[in-house]
From Swiss-Prot:
Gene3D superfamilies: YehU-like. NCBIfam families: PRK00304.1. It comes from Pseudomonas savastanoi pv. phaseolicola (strain 1448A / Race 6). It holds the Pfam family UPF0270. This is UPF0270 protein PSPPH_1506.
Length: 75
C-alpha cells in the first residue's frame, strides 16, 4: 500500500526519513550531513521520484524509488 507523504504528520515524516538515511548500508561511506540527506529524500518524495510503501505483511514502512515499486500499486 502506498502512503502519500503529505498525509503524514510532519514529525512522523521526518523521523521516517531520518530512520531511512541512517540505516546501515544507505550511506555508502557518504559523510553528507544528516540534514542534507533528509532534504534530498524529502525532495525526491515531493517530485514523485520516491514513495512511502507500507508492507501489510511485515507492518513496516519503507521509502522506495518509484520505479522499484510493483506497478499494480499505482492502479
Amino acid at each position: 500500500m502506498l502512503i502519500p507523504y503529505d498525509q503524514l504528520e510532519p514529525d512522523t515524516l521526518t523521523r521516517l526519513i531520518e530512520d531511512f538515511v541512517t540505516r546501515e548500508g544507505t550511506d555508502n561511506g557518504d559523510e553528507t550531513p544528516l540534514q542534507t540527506r533528509v532534504l534530498r529524500v524529502r525532495h525526491a518524495l515531493t517530485k514523485g521520484q520516491a514513495v512511502i510503501f507500507f508492507d501489510l505483511e511485515s507492518q513496516q514502512c519503507q521509502l522506495m524509488l518509484k520505479h522499484d515499486v510493483p506497478k499494480e500499486f499505482f492502479e
